[in-house]
Every structure is written in structure tokens, then in C-alpha cells.
Amino acid sequence: MTGAFGTVTIDGKVWNQIALRPVTPFWKFNIAWDLVFYFDQDGNVYDENWNFSSGEKAKNTIIDKIYYISYGRKSDPLYFKIGALDRVDLGYGILVNGYSNAVQYPSVRNVGLDLSVKNKLGSAQGFVNDFKQNIGIVGVRFRLPNNFRNLFFMPVAFSVVLDRNQYLGLKDFDGDGRPDLVDHFPRNDDYWLDSDGDGLADNHAAEFDRDGDGFPDVYDIDAIHSFWDNLGEAVGQDFSNETFYDSLPDQEAILLPEPLNVKKSPDPIGALAIDFGYPIVVQDNMNITVYAQAAQMMGTTLHPGTGDELNLGMGLVPFGVASHFGPASFSFEYRMIPKGQFEFSYWNRAYDLERATFVTSFGETKVVTKESKLGRYGEQKGFYAHLGINIGSILKAGASYQNLLGKNWDDIEADYVESENKSFLASLNLTKSISRLKYARLYYQQRNVPNPFDFEYTEGTIMGYQAGIEIASGIMLNYTFQRSFRDLDGDGDVDSPDETINLTTIETSFSL
């Protein structure tokens, strides 16, 4: 059994943690549990991950205790892993490249699925982001068997990805469908709106004056009579015999709008893709594959100027090459977005952070999805390259770069202008321990900016590092830090201090 104790940051608050992580091996299965308790300096227990108040909450609590369940290895005919997914790719990555459901851990603890199957009928690969969301995001790729080459001339695969409701990325503690940020009663699923801020929900049985103007606006005969009686007593008159004695005093209550209900107003997005690949060199220490791929996104986005709905677009890779030379790997693609409204590798490491966010502008809070921002991209074309290399037996490094030229929306010009759309990703991993440093990892991602080397952060920026240091036999100090960004005021930048989101975990793990 392993365990850990330390501190974590959840929703901006520091909590102490005690965790027990027993592992149960069975045949080719490995089952690891994650029994974690959080408490603050006052002894208050963080109960969101120990909530049995309803059937749905109980289900999620039980699922939450699964650290992982794995079967086999990725090279086996059958492999799957249930739990935290560090990295998921589909095919050559036109839709899914580097997706992770663990970027907000431990603040958000997702339990997903990574699956691969290989047999004479072909191969299949799939993933699910989180069973607690009742499968919010699902992706599948089918690669046809080799005997289909007579039909397609080379190996072919089809992919589909669906996010059935982008709003599921918003936190909703009580499960009433209203995200916590717009729910006036985030821990009570019976109530969600309090227009006058008096502590009584608009739908509370004792709330007769919802807008707080002193005049009853809910038809309750006792409350109405009480109002007229009190008014009559104040002015020295008896209204009990008047015709209006049974009438509502307030005929036009001014109430706050109903908050978003993600259960009744889902916003899905999906995509289809096809890819062809043909190996031209296959040797022990070298292989080269040429490929092509195309994808069509399904859904609508918004024109950044008019707000009109636009259909999502298509991305094409008419030519790509992937190669491995000993310790190095290299890939290159020529990319095209014929009509705009498309993003390559849409489901990437930062997707759960960009999926749906709240923006407050001019006193109004609204939900902004990643899909709604695709309207900023017009027709584009350019290249993408990736290099990975093992440096001896100690380090593994990787870097990716995209440079697209075409039409992008400019807020100052209020029009699409010719500009560059670039992305840069880099990572460095320690693959062999050095003295007491048992593991280390650094990563940086900057997507869809004019120049990623200006290091002007956006919502597409995510960076962090992890390290584990052995301080005694069987005892290790683990440190995790991640920084991402949110445009909370909708001004197009993330310069405000509260728009920087830091996630820090410090724990001491031990083996029994």
C-alpha cells in the first residue's frame, strides 16, 4: 500500500490532505484506490468528494475513489485504463492530440477511459473523459484491416469525437444543473435564484416578495391580506371590504433572469475525421510513413463582429510524414483550413480548461465555450512540425511548432486581417532517476497566437512541472505546479492577477 500527506490548492484555498492508495493486482488487472481526506486549518472537512446525499452524488463519490484500473499494456491486443488520463491521442492528431482529463487534479478528479483493441478485423482506439459526467466527451478511431487496401490503396482509419455538452465542464456541486458561479444556492438543489438577495429563494414557500420592493408578487391569499391589513393599519383604514383586498399588490415583479441550466440547455460539439497512412520504410531502427488526413467539425460558432451563427469548418492535411530514427522521431504536415472556423488538435491538453468558462463584462456574467471562439479563425494554411528525442537514457525532450498564415479576426480593425496563427509546445521528462531525484517533468503550451515566443499569455497557455525527491527509504516528496489563464472580464487579455490560475500540490508519499 502507498499513501501520502501534504497540502493541495482547491478552488483557491489551501487544504491539508491524507491519502491512502492501496493497489490490488489480479491477473492482468491492476486496481488502485484513491482514498483522500482534505481538511483545513480549522478542522473543517472538504466533503465534496464524500457526498452520499443522492443517488447521483453517491455514484460519483464511489467512482471518485478509483485512482485507476488497468488491463494489459498498450502494445497488447487488448488494453484499457480507467482513471486519470495523462495523454490521449487519436491517429495522427488532427482532432485529438495530447488531451488529458487530469489537468485540474485534484480540484477536479475525473475518472475516464483509454481503450485500444487490435485483431484481424482491424484496430480500434477510444477514450472517455469522465464517467461522473455520464460520458461527457467520447472519441473513437477505427482502422480498417489490411485487406481493405484493395479498396483504398493504403491503410485507412475513421475517427469521431463528441462532446455532448460543453457546459459539463462547469462545476455544479449540488447537481441541479445550474453551475456554482450562477447558482445563488450552490449546495442546495431545491433552490438556485434569489432576485432580491434576502436569503430566500424565489421559489421558496415563504418568499412572497421576490423582487424586494415591499409589495407581494406571489399569489398567496394570507400574504396578500396581511399586506393590505398592515397598510390599512398604518394609514388608519380598513381595506378588508375593498374589491382589491384579494388582488396582488405587485403586478409586475422585476426578477433576475433564470440562470443557465446545463441539463435543459446542452451545447454539443462533434467532429469526423479520416486518415490514410502508408509506410514506405520499415526497419529495426528506422521507419517512415507518409499520410494524409481531413476532419470536419460539427456545430456552430459565432461571428466575432456581428454575433451571427456560423457553421464550423474543415481542416485538411494533404501531405504529412512521420518518422523514427533510433532515439529521435520527427513529423511534418502541410495544413489547410479552407473556409475557417476550425482548429487543428481541438481536443488538446488545455481543452478541459477552455471547454466552457464564465466571463463577466459590464456587470453581466455569461458562459463562453471554446466552440464559440472558432469564428475568429478564417481561411488559413501553413505547416506543422514535431521533434522528439531521447537524450541518452536520462532525458526525453519534445517540441511542436505550427505556423499558419491567413485571415484572423482583429478586434481593433473589427475585421478579418491577414496575420499569422502560431502554436508552440515543449516538454522535458526525466526518464531515469538521478541520485535522489526520482522523476521530473516540465511542459509548456502556447496555442493560436501571432508569436508564441513573445510569451504573452492567453487562455491557450498552460505550463507546469512535477518533481519527486526521495527523502528516505520508501518516502518521497512530490511537488506539482501548474499555471493556466482565464479571461474573466472578456477584454481579450489575461493581465489581471485573478486571471492567473495556479494549481499547487505538495505531498509526502510513503510505501507500507
Q: Over which residues does each language-model region extend?
A:
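Outer-membrane beta-barrel "beta-signal"
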Residues: 69, 176, 498-512
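Gram-negative (and chloroplast) outer-membrane scaffold detector with strong preference
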Residues: 63-72, 76-79
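Signature for the C-terminal beta-barrel architecture of outer-membrane proteins
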Residues: 13, 44-45, 77-79, 94-96, ...
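Short glycine/proline- and aromatic-enriched beta-strand/turn motifs that initiate or cap beta-hairpins
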Residues: 1-21
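Surface-exposed loop and membrane-interface regions of Gram-negative outer-membrane beta-barrel proteins
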Residues: 31-68, 95, 302-303, 309
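Short, solvent-exposed loop/edge-beta patches enriched in aromatic
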Residues: 22-31, 73-77, 434, 471-473
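C-terminal closing repeat unit and adjoining cap/tail of repeat-based domains
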Residues: 466-488
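Beta-strand-dominated lipid-handling architectures at cellular/organellar boundaries
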Residues: 1-5, 286-288, 482
